[in-house]
């Protein structure tokens, strides 16, 4: 994974083309799958907060077990809420409906702040370093 990122654009295109031809898939699908794997490898082996995230699976997990034959469009990741200051069992406490709504709102705000203030700066620095380019990841303000 790390080796290919250092190859020239021509070498990368060649391996993508050869893989696409062998698997009878489009180049775009092969390249997209490469980047999904690249991001997963980074998140779970190099990322500062790797011990606080969990791979939820979805399409990627089903694909690994040969349950389906399609490529992932996204990466499903869950955050360990203990990094936000909650105890392991706190989200499971019995609450009234209103208390649960307030708790959900609070954890969503804290998660959003953690991602934007803690995670994104490291992701941008690390990806810039890994890819040798200025890199900017951001949270789309229209995405909720």
For the regions a protein language model found, what residue spans apply to each?
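Compositionally biased terminal segments of proteins
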Residues: 1-144
